[in-house]
Amino acid sequence: IKVFDEEARKLEGISFLAQGTIYPDILESDGVKAHHNVGGLPEDMDFELVEPVKLLFKDEVRVVGRALGLPVSMVERQPFPGPGLGVRCLGAITRDRLAALRESDAILREEFGKAGLAEKVWQFFTVVPDFRSTGVRDGKRAFDWPVIIRAVNTVDAMTATVPEIPWTVLQAITSRVLTEVPGVCRVLYDLTPKPVGTIEWE
C-alpha cells in the first residue's frame, strides 16, 4: 500500500482508481480470507474508488463483458490475483522461489494447452510454498522447494471442484518441472474442493 500510495502521488490529473472487485471478494472478506481489494486502501487517498462489477459473480461479469462486445480472450481469461504472483509464492518472496513459480506455471500452461485442457479448466496455476522438502538427486540428498499444481472448475467462484486431469498430463508436467526448474524436488497436485479450501492458497 505504501508503494502504491507513493506512485499514486506522482501522477497528475488522475481522479479515479478502478478495481476489479467481484462479489465473492466481498463475501469472503467477511470472515473467510483477506482480499487486497476489499478495505485495504488508505483512507486519505485522493482517488475516488470505482468498482463497477463489485456486486456481480464471475459468471455474471462474463455475461456483461460479452454484452459489451469485449474480446473473448479478455472475457474468458483466467482470474489473476491483484497482488500478482506474491499470492502464489507463499511466505517471504525470494528470487529463487519466484523464478520456480514462473517457470513451473509456464510448464503447466504449456502442457494444459497441448492436452486441450486450457479451455476446459476454469483456472489453473502453480504454487510454491515457503518450506523445503527432502529429495534425492544424482544419488545425493536434495533439500528443495515443492511445486503445487492447483486446477479448479467453477461457475461463480463461490464453490469449486477439482477436475480429473489425465495421469499422462500430470506425469508430463511433473517430469518437466523436476528436470527444467532449478531448486524443485517435488510436485504435488492439490485435490481440495471449495469449500473446504479456497481457490487461491492465500
Predicted regions and their residues:
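ATP/NTP-dependent adenylation/nucleotidyl-transfer catalytic domains that generate, transfer
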Residues: I1-E202
